[in-house]
Amino acid sequence: MAAGLEIRRARPEELPACADLYVRVLCETFTWQPPERHRREDFLQAARSEEVYVAVEDGRILGLAAFYRPQNFLHSLYVDVRNRGIGKRLLDHVSAVASGPVSLKVQAPNKLAQLFYEREGFTCVERGQDPGSDVAWLRLVREPDSPA
């Protein structure tokens, strides 16, 4: 676990760096999609209506979580450095500020994310496919008192 790691709300001036992290991690992770599909503008647009939390260590943003409070929906969770507990810390923070069960969607080919969320107490409640997409998704939910 990252001891010197701070989880907090992103400052407005940090959103461009968050958008860069978002695009970089998407391009590395979502290899089944063309890189040009992942755009900074998409993140910045979504961030206008979401709460963006960051994991910061030594002034560097190592991860982010974008949370849409009206639906307790975790829209994005991306980390720059894996296997340090950063994703778990961000996820736990979002769960702590949520007003009920947190839900999210994960693309079916993203097996590492599915394993991570299942390990953190999420269960699959729905499977589907967005219109115009050939990639299936799973909607996962974690109840507030789920052991993680």
Regions found by a protein language model. Give the residues of each.
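Conserved GNAT acetyl-CoA-binding A-motif
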Residues: 97-109
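Acetyl-CoA-dependent GNAT
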Residues: 9-82, 91-93
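Conserved acetyl-CoA-binding loop-helix of GNAT-fold acetyltransferases
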Residues: 83-96, 115, 119
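Short glycine/proline-centered loop/turn elements that form peptide/ligand docking sites
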Residues: 87, 91, 109-113, 130-136
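Active-site beta-strand termini and strand-to-loop segments that position acidic
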Residues: 56-58, 140-144
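Conserved N-terminal entry element of GNAT/NAT acetyltransferase domains
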Residues: 1-13, 142-148
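Short hydrophobic/aromatic beta-strand or adjacent loop that forms the aromatic wall/cage
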Residues: 50, 134-140
